[in-house]
Swiss-Prot record:
Family: Belongs to the class-II aminoacyl-tRNA synthetase family. ProS type 3 subfamily.
Domain notes: Consists of three domains: the N-terminal catalytic domain, the anticodon-binding domain and the C-terminal extension.
Name of the protein in question: Proline--tRNA ligase
Record NCBIfam families: proS_fam_I (TIGR00408)
Transmembrane segments: none
Lineage: Bacteria, Bacillati, Bacillota, Clostridia, Peptostreptococcales
Length: 480
């Protein structure tokens, strides 16, 4: 192996040494992204985009199963629309990118580059809705948004990112609330079943909720370094936007009413979460459901008669059921290929050589445990299918164990400070529910309330931070 090849495969900073550099090394060396000339605007390369496509395909199917339809709304939004909902514009104003010229001519009105689409969608809904018979509106769009971030990191916080945003209208508050929680549950199911990423679900505090929302619900995941990642949100917007945009319909009694509105979204930051939950010092570890290549076949001693033919035969047997690739490159050794595919996180590697052919077997290597076993070629399809299922279950189990080991209960502010300094992670504590107390905690420690979980625990009767009567048990953490 040449020095260049050795560096390409092995030079990943250990996560225990420098987690941020480990993350950067992994995304670069596995060819997920590249940096563009504009800060914060990343290029998602084919391997990274294939991961997003697999997430997108899974979720799009779930959306359609629950009655939602896809559409597309414009990228540019007139400033006057953004100003219609005061709380919303105040929340997004620092992050908005503006278009001021068309060609060489200054525009009569500034246009903002979509940071989120509530305003333009509500403007259109006001024209489309007339009667209660039109409801519910169940629409989603897949697009990119721009939020001018000062500090950026690929997938986790970028000035442009890909996402989906659903926007629905309903007759009653109860229907809107049911929709909000239904979509949050779809996100949770996607995170745990597809991404093997355990999440805590709950409600955001008033301080942390979406600008203009009646209530925001979230799913929060814990990364290897003990920081939290907000992995998806679902908002009950009440009648805030529908009133501001004069969206009305004639109800069953012929009276004009404002409908109730929801919005919900997840983005490519899920990919950052997958990397930081499952990855190790060899590189990516991808859950089978999203891996661009689920199975890679590497011939050993491919120059020997029959080896390459058998490898092609195995690929043809597997390709209709699995995403499979045959690495028949003749300018790299099998050992180099093993290291490269491990770094790229492919769940299963099949090794086939002359002795394997003689014994009617292949060696199956699993990326999650770095173990290999011989499997009869007669049982190959069944063995691969079972192993992929085992890998997904094992990744979820290990991620839950990691999260639980990094989750702590504290009773006092000093105790939380000590825990967060020594061993960052999720902290569970009782909280009074007051904004001033929450702001004090953040100002003192940089720790935020991640959510008020649906599954409440009684850890005491007083707030851990100010001593007042406690209202909720909350999860806190430093976050991306």
């Amino acid at each position: 192996m040449s020095k260049k090849e050795k560096q390409f495969v092995e030079e990943i900073t250990p996560m225990e040494v420098d987690f941020a550099q480990w993350y950067t090394d992994v995304i670069k060396k596995t060819d997920l992204v590249d940096y563009s000339p504009v800060k914060g605007f990343m290029v998602i390369k084919p391997y990274g985009y294939a991961i997003w496509e697999n997430i997108q395909n899974y979720m799009d199917k779930r959306f359609k199963e629950t009655g939602h339809k896809n559409c597309y709304f414009p990228l540019l939004i007139p400033e006057s629309l953004l100003k219609k909902e005061a709380e919303h514009v105040e929340g997004f104003a620092p992050e908005v990118a503006w278009v001021t010229h068309g060609g060489n001519e200054e525009l009569a009105e500034r246009l903002c580059v979509r940071p989120t689409s509530e305003t333009i969608i509500c403007e259109m809904y006001s024209k489309w809705l007339t009667s209660y018979r039109d409801l519910p509106f169940l629409y989603n769009q897949w697009c990119s948004v721009v939020r001018w971030e000062k500090s950026t990191r690929p997938f986790l916080r970028t000035s442009e990112f890909l996402w989906q945003e659903g926007h629905t209208l309903h007759e009653t508050y109860e229907e809107a609330q049911a929709e909000t929680l239904q979509m949050l549950n779809i996100y949770r199911e996607t995170a745990e079943n597809l991404l093997a990423m355990p999440v805590v679900i709950g409600q955001k505090s008033e301080k942390e909720k979406f600008a203009g929302a009646y209530a925001t619900y979230t799913m929060e995941a814990l990364m290897h370094d003990g920081k939290a990642l907000q992995a998806g949100t679902s908002h009950n917007l009440g009648q805030h936007f529908t009133t501001a945009f004069d969206i009305t319909y004639s109800d069953r009694n012929g009276e004009l009413k404002h409908p109730y509105h929801t919005s919900w979204g997840v983005s490519t930051r899920l990919i950052g979460g997958i990397i930081m939950v499952h990855g190790d010092n060899r590189g990516l570890v991808l859950p089978p459901g999203i891996a661009p290549t689920q199975v890679v076949i590497v011939p050993v001693a491919s120059h020997k008669e029959g080896v390459l033919d058998k490898a092609n035969e195995l690929r043809d047997r597997l390709k209709d059921k699995f995403r499979v690739e045959l690495d028949d490159r003749d300018n790299y050794s099998p050992g180099w290929k093993f290291n490269e595919w491990e770094m790229k996180g492919v769940p299963i590697r099949i090794e086939i050589g002359p002795r394997d052919i003689e014994n009617n077997q292949a060696m199956l290597f699993r990326r999650d445990e770095l173990e290999k076993d011989a499997v009869s070629l007669d049982d190959l399809e069944e063995a691969v299918e079972k192993l992929l299922e085992d890998i997904n279950n094992n990744l979820l189990y290990k991620a839950k164990m990691m999260r639980d080991e990094k989750t702590y209960i504290v009773k006092t502010f000093d105790e939380m400070k000590e825990v967060m300094e020594i061993k960052p992670g999720f902290v569970k504590a009782m909280w009074c529910g007051e904004r001033a107390c929450e702001e004090h905690v953040k100002a003192e420690t940089g720790v935020t309330i991640r959510c008020i979980p649906f599954e409440q625990e009684n850890l005491g009767h007083t707030c851990a931070f100010c001593g007042k009567e406690a209202k909720h048990m909350v999860y806190l953490a430093k976050a991306y």
